[in-house]
């Protein structure tokens, strides 16, 4: 804005006006040359044709309106150089919009004119069909003024592409590229599905296929390596306890107290016994499968005892039927039975070792001499047999104890329930379902008052009645 200076003279007023005019914004659009686009409108309906022509002229377009596709084609043949844009309807009487579009695209003089289709059908199939045939745009009726105002952009784009042919190859419509890709992928997928099963992933580019094949091979190798590592680790875990326990059992067998003569007998005769011992006894009570291991060890121990007493091996069905009762009774007292089994097995193992030493010494010495060692061995054998008998008796007593405890618990719960039922019945008898009254005097007064059909009635004095 210019400076405002108040002066008395006329020269001062003129200077103020000149400054204000110079400060105004200059609109350069007035000086630029205006280019008017010429549009060929093809519409069969009269009213819509008149409305669209009015809107286009309001947006500074020159309009040539035609009601028929054949008339539009004749206009294009005569004045193709005077038309910049074609706006046509799909449903036309003589030649349809698709046929007109095909004629325009095939003609050399008209193929550079952008064709815009318009219709009331908003289906995607129709849009794709028109865009594939070469339409520049697809407008859905009713159309807006803004859509008609922006039609010049299509003409501008065609002119820029015509001037620069290298840009034409780079800036093809994205919709056309996508449609071509979708058609190719559909054809390829059909071809591959006919040839093989759809379980395998199919890639259409060779580079992508090679990359994915390489990835699949790498993934297989990695999976194989991890599988081998896990298998080695599992094998090491399985082998480790057996070797440890076997070494320990051999060290225990070959002791300094038995002498050098027993090394051979221990190493040969007791390896099988060590393996059976490890199978029968559970290695740890804290394992997740200790319950099942205890039941298996109990079954094997009972079968061995029955066979030793009877002397005849029994069938597996008979032994299984007899063992069901024992295993069901042993559920509550597992720890005591495990300790007794371990003690009895250790005693029997020692007795076997001592017996083998005695027999070896008898075979080596020609003269039968009873030494202190033999007497001690016989005493330990007797003690071992007594301990095994005590262990069996302890097992039977331990199986009987939980039964007694369960029966006592059931009796106590039953008696408690009966007492609660008796208490409830007595309480129900003592209940009074009458209305509780807070003040007894009011209750008496209410009972004394006369009632008629359940409602109170006022009493009238006899004196008042006589006077009246």
Swiss-Prot record:
Domain CCT residues, every copy: 417-459
Residue spans of biased composition, Polar residues class: 168-177, 194-203, 328-364, 458-468
Biological role: Transcriptional repressor of CCA1 and LHY, and positive regulator of LWD1 and LWD2 expression. Controls photoperiodic flowering response and temperature compensation. Involved in the positive and negative feedback loops of the circadian clock. Expression of several members of the ARR-like family is controlled by circadian rhythm. Regulated at the transcriptional level by a corepressor complex consisting of ELF4, ELF3, and LUX. APRR9, APRR7, and APRR5 coordinately act on the upstream region of the target genes to repress their expression from noon until midnight.
Source species of the chain: Arabidopsis thaliana
Protein name (database record): Two-component response regulator-like APRR9
Keywords assigned by UniProt, alphabetized: Biological rhythms, Nucleus, Phosphoprotein, Transcription, Transcription regulation, Two-component regulatory system
Induction data: Up-regulated by heat-shock.
SMART domains: REC
SUPFAM superfamilies assigned: CheY-like
More about this protein: Regulated at the level of mRNA maturation and alternative splicing by SKIP and PRMT5. The expression of APRR9, APRR7, and APRR5 requires the presence of LWD1 and/or LWD2, indicating the existence of a positive feedback loop within the circadian clock.
Subcellular compartments: Nucleus
Segments of this protein annotated with the region Disordered: 168-203, 302-416, 442-468
InterPro entries: ARR-like, CCT_domain, CheY-like_superfamily, Sig_transdc_resp-reg_receiver
Location of the Response regulatory domain: 38-156
Maturation and modification: Phosphorylated. Phosphorylation varies throughout the diurnal cycle.
GO terms for cellular component: nucleus
């Amino acid at each position: 804005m210019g400076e405002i200076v108040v002066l008395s003279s006329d020269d001062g007023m003129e200077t103020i006006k000149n400054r204000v005019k110079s400060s105004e914004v200059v609109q350069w659009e007035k000086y630029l040359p205006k280019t008017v686009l010429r549009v060929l409108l093809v519409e069969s309906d009269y009213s819509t044709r008149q409305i669209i022509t009015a809107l286009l002229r309001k947006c500074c377009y020159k309009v040539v309106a035609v009601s028929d596709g054949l008339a539009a084609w004749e206009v294009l043949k005569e004045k193709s150089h005077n038309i910049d844009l074609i706006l046509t309807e799909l449903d036309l009487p003589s030649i349809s919009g698709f046929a007109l579009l095909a004629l325009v695209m095939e003609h050399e003089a008209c193929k550079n004119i952008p064709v815009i289709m318009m219709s009331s059908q908003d289906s995607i199939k129709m849009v794709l069909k028109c865009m594939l045939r070469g339409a520049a745009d697809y407008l859905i009726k009713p159309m807006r003024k803004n859509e008609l105002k922006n039609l010049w952009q299509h003409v501008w784009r065609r002119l820029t592409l015509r001037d620069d042919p290298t840009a034409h190859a780079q800036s093809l419509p994205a919709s056309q590229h996508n449609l071509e890709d979708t058609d190719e992928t559909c054809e390829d997928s059909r071809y591959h599905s006919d040839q093989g099963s759809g379980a395998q992933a199919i890639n259409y580019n060779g580079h992508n296929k090679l990359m994915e094949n390489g990835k699949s091979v790498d993934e297989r190798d990695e999976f194989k390596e991890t599988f081998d590592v896990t298998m080695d680790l599992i094998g090491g875990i399985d082998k480790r306890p057996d070797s440890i326990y076997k070494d320990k059992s051999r060290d225990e067998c070959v002791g300094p107290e038995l002498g050098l003569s027993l090394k051979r007998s221990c190493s040969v005769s007791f390896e099988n016994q060590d393996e059976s011992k490890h199978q029968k006894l559970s290695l740890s009570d804290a394992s997740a499968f200790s319950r099942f291991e205890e039941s298996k060890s109990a079954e094997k121990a009972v079968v061995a005892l029955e066979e030793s007493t009877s002397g005849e091996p029994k069938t597996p069905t008979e032994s299984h039927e007899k063992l069901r009762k024992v295993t069901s009774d042993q559920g509550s007292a597992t720890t005591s039975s495990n300790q007794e089994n371990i003690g009895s097995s250790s005693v029997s193992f020692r007795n076997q070792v001592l017996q083998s030493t005695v027999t070896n010494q008898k075979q080596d010495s020609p003269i039968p001499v009873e030494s202190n060692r033999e007497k001690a061995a016989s005493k330990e054998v007797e003690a071992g047999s007594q301990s095994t008998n005590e262990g069996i008796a302890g097992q039977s007593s331990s199986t009987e104890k939980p039964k007694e405890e369960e029966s006592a618990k059931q009796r106590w719960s039953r008696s408690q329930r009966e007492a609660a039922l008796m208490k409830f019945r007595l309480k129900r008898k003592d209940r009074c379902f009458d209305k509780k009254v807070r003040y007894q005097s009011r209750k008496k007064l209410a009972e004394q008052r006369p009632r008629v059909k359940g409602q109170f009635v006022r009493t009238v004095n006899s004196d008042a009645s006589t006077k009246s």
